[in-house]
Amino acid sequence: MIDPDREQKKNGGVAEIIRQKTGMHLSPYFPAAKFAWLQENVEEVKQAKRDNDLCLGTIDTWLLFKLTKGEVYATDYSNASRTQLFNIHNLKWDKEICTWFGINADMLPEVCDSSMQYGTTDFEGYFQTPIPICGVIGDSQGALFGQGCIEKGMVKATYGTGSSV
Protein backbone atom coordinates (compact mmCIF):
# COMPACT_ATOMS: atom_id res chain seq x y z
CA MET A 1 0.00 0.00 0.00
CA ILE A 2 1.06 3.56 -0.61
CA ASP A 3 2.41 5.62 2.25
CA PRO A 4 1.53 9.08 0.89
CA ASP A 5 3.98 10.99 3.10
CA ARG A 6 6.91 8.70 2.30
CA GLU A 7 6.09 8.55 -1.41
CA GLN A 8 5.69 12.31 -1.63
CA LYS A 9 9.08 12.84 0.00
CA LYS A 10 10.69 10.10 -2.10
CA ASN A 11 9.66 11.28 -5.53
CA GLY A 12 7.18 14.12 -5.12
CA GLY A 13 5.06 12.73 -7.92
CA VAL A 14 2.47 10.35 -6.51
CA ALA A 15 0.17 13.02 -5.10
CA GLU A 16 0.33 14.99 -8.33
CA ILE A 17 -0.37 11.91 -10.47
CA ILE A 18 -3.40 11.12 -8.30
CA ARG A 19 -4.61 14.72 -8.62
CA GLN A 20 -4.14 14.73 -12.40
CA LYS A 21 -5.92 11.41 -12.93
CA THR A 22 -8.73 11.76 -10.38
CA GLY A 23 -9.12 15.51 -9.98
CA MET A 24 -8.69 15.04 -6.23
CA HIS A 25 -5.90 15.89 -3.83
CA LEU A 26 -4.37 12.94 -1.98
CA SER A 27 -6.29 12.65 1.30
CA PRO A 28 -7.36 10.00 3.81
CA TYR A 29 -10.88 11.47 3.58
CA PHE A 30 -11.66 9.51 0.41
CA PRO A 31 -12.45 5.77 0.20
CA ALA A 32 -9.11 4.74 -1.36
CA ALA A 33 -7.21 5.22 1.91
CA LYS A 34 -10.05 3.67 3.91
CA PHE A 35 -10.11 0.60 1.64
CA ALA A 36 -6.34 0.26 2.09
CA TRP A 37 -6.64 0.54 5.87
CA LEU A 38 -9.37 -2.12 5.99
CA GLN A 39 -7.20 -4.52 3.99
CA GLU A 40 -4.31 -4.08 6.40
CA ASN A 41 -6.17 -3.97 9.73
CA VAL A 42 -9.38 -6.02 9.62
CA GLU A 43 -8.86 -9.78 9.69
CA GLU A 44 -12.16 -10.59 7.92
CA VAL A 45 -11.19 -8.25 5.09
CA LYS A 46 -7.70 -9.76 4.86
CA GLN A 47 -9.23 -13.24 4.65
CA ALA A 48 -11.77 -12.21 2.02
CA LYS A 49 -8.93 -10.76 -0.06
CA ARG A 50 -6.89 -13.97 0.30
CA ASP A 51 -9.98 -15.95 -0.73
CA ASN A 52 -10.49 -13.65 -3.74
CA ASP A 53 -13.91 -12.80 -2.28
CA LEU A 54 -13.45 -9.13 -1.42
CA CYS A 55 -15.69 -6.47 -2.90
CA LEU A 56 -15.02 -2.78 -2.27
CA GLY A 57 -17.46 0.00 -2.99
CA THR A 58 -19.33 2.98 -1.64
CA ILE A 59 -22.75 2.95 0.04
CA ASP A 60 -24.62 2.99 -3.27
CA THR A 61 -22.82 -0.19 -4.34
CA TRP A 62 -23.77 -1.92 -1.09
CA LEU A 63 -27.41 -0.78 -1.37
CA LEU A 64 -27.69 -2.01 -4.97
CA PHE A 65 -26.10 -5.33 -4.03
CA LYS A 66 -28.49 -5.81 -1.09
CA LEU A 67 -31.63 -4.58 -2.86
CA THR A 68 -30.98 -6.88 -5.84
CA LYS A 69 -30.14 -9.87 -3.61
CA GLY A 70 -26.54 -9.88 -4.82
CA GLU A 71 -27.34 -9.73 -8.52
CA VAL A 72 -25.93 -6.23 -9.13
CA TYR A 73 -22.46 -5.05 -8.10
CA ALA A 74 -22.25 -1.57 -9.59
CA THR A 75 -21.90 2.14 -8.99
CA ASP A 76 -22.36 5.26 -11.07
CA TYR A 77 -19.78 7.73 -12.35
CA SER A 78 -20.56 10.32 -9.66
CA ASN A 79 -19.80 7.92 -6.82
CA ALA A 80 -16.83 6.26 -8.55
CA SER A 81 -15.28 9.68 -9.12
CA ARG A 82 -15.20 10.32 -5.36
CA THR A 83 -13.19 7.20 -4.44
CA GLN A 84 -9.79 8.60 -5.50
CA LEU A 85 -9.36 5.42 -7.58
CA PHE A 86 -11.29 6.44 -10.70
CA ASN A 87 -9.59 8.05 -13.69
CA ILE A 88 -11.88 10.90 -14.73
CA HIS A 89 -10.28 11.13 -18.18
CA ASN A 90 -10.81 7.56 -19.42
CA LEU A 91 -13.74 6.80 -17.05
CA LYS A 92 -12.16 3.62 -15.70
CA TRP A 93 -10.72 2.41 -12.42
CA ASP A 94 -7.08 3.44 -12.54
CA LYS A 95 -4.99 0.29 -12.11
CA GLU A 96 -1.82 2.22 -11.22
CA ILE A 97 -3.54 4.13 -8.42
CA CYS A 98 -5.34 1.00 -7.25
CA THR A 99 -1.97 -0.75 -6.96
CA TRP A 100 -0.59 2.08 -4.84
CA PHE A 101 -3.45 1.51 -2.38
CA GLY A 102 -3.10 -2.29 -2.46
CA ILE A 103 -6.36 -2.71 -4.34
CA ASN A 104 -7.03 -5.07 -7.22
CA ALA A 105 -9.34 -3.20 -9.63
CA ASP A 106 -11.36 -6.41 -10.04
CA MET A 107 -12.61 -5.89 -6.45
CA LEU A 108 -14.33 -2.66 -7.50
CA PRO A 109 -17.85 -2.41 -8.93
CA GLU A 110 -18.85 -1.95 -12.54
CA VAL A 111 -19.26 1.76 -13.29
CA CYS A 112 -22.47 2.73 -15.08
CA ASP A 113 -24.48 5.79 -16.05
CA SER A 114 -26.43 7.42 -13.24
CA SER A 115 -29.70 7.06 -15.12
CA MET A 116 -30.34 3.48 -16.23
CA GLN A 117 -32.10 0.39 -14.98
CA TYR A 118 -29.66 -1.27 -12.59
CA GLY A 119 -31.93 -4.13 -11.62
CA THR A 120 -35.09 -4.78 -9.65
CA THR A 121 -36.01 -5.20 -6.02
CA ASP A 122 -38.94 -6.60 -4.08
CA PHE A 123 -37.45 -4.99 -0.96
CA GLU A 124 -37.07 -8.32 0.83
CA GLY A 125 -40.61 -9.38 -0.10
CA TYR A 126 -42.31 -6.13 0.85
CA PHE A 127 -43.39 -5.51 -2.76
CA GLN A 128 -45.47 -8.25 -4.39
CA THR A 129 -44.01 -7.36 -7.77
CA PRO A 130 -40.35 -6.33 -8.09
CA ILE A 131 -39.84 -2.67 -8.96
CA PRO A 132 -36.99 -1.33 -11.11
CA ILE A 133 -34.03 0.53 -9.67
CA CYS A 134 -33.54 3.20 -12.33
CA GLY A 135 -30.90 5.50 -10.98
CA VAL A 136 -27.92 6.00 -8.72
CA ILE A 137 -26.22 9.31 -7.95
CA GLY A 138 -23.97 10.78 -5.28
CA ASP A 139 -25.62 12.95 -2.65
CA SER A 140 -23.98 16.27 -3.53
CA GLN A 141 -24.41 15.61 -7.24
CA GLY A 142 -28.06 14.67 -6.73
CA ALA A 143 -28.59 17.82 -4.65
CA LEU A 144 -27.99 19.85 -7.83
CA PHE A 145 -31.15 18.38 -9.33
CA GLY A 146 -33.07 18.58 -6.07
CA GLN A 147 -32.36 22.30 -5.82
CA GLY A 148 -33.21 22.94 -9.46
CA CYS A 149 -29.69 23.62 -10.77
CA ILE A 150 -30.38 22.34 -14.25
CA GLU A 151 -29.19 25.17 -16.48
CA LYS A 152 -25.69 26.15 -17.53
CA GLY A 153 -24.17 28.69 -15.15
CA MET A 154 -26.33 27.81 -12.13
CA VAL A 155 -24.36 27.25 -8.91
CA LYS A 156 -25.17 25.53 -5.65
CA ALA A 157 -23.21 25.12 -2.42
CA THR A 158 -23.81 21.96 -0.39
CA TYR A 159 -22.67 21.75 3.22
CA GLY A 160 -22.72 18.42 5.05
CA THR A 161 -20.09 15.84 5.90
CA GLY A 162 -18.19 17.41 3.05
CA SER A 163 -18.75 20.69 1.27
CA SER A 164 -18.99 21.21 -2.44
CA VAL A 165 -19.76 24.04 -4.85
Each language-model region and where it sits:
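Class I SAM-dependent methyltransferase SAM-binding "motif I" and its flanking Rossmann-like core
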Residues: L38
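NAD(P)-dependent dehydrogenases' Rossmann-like dinucleotide-binding region
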Residues: L54-D60
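ATP-dependent carbohydrate kinase catalytic cores
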Residues: V72, D76-V165
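Rossmann-like flavin
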Residues: I18, N41-Q47
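Active-site phosphate-binding/coordination module
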Residues: M1-A32, D139
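Flexible, glycine/proline-enriched loop segments at strand-loop-helix junctions
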Residues: Q20-P28, D51-L54, A80-I88, I133
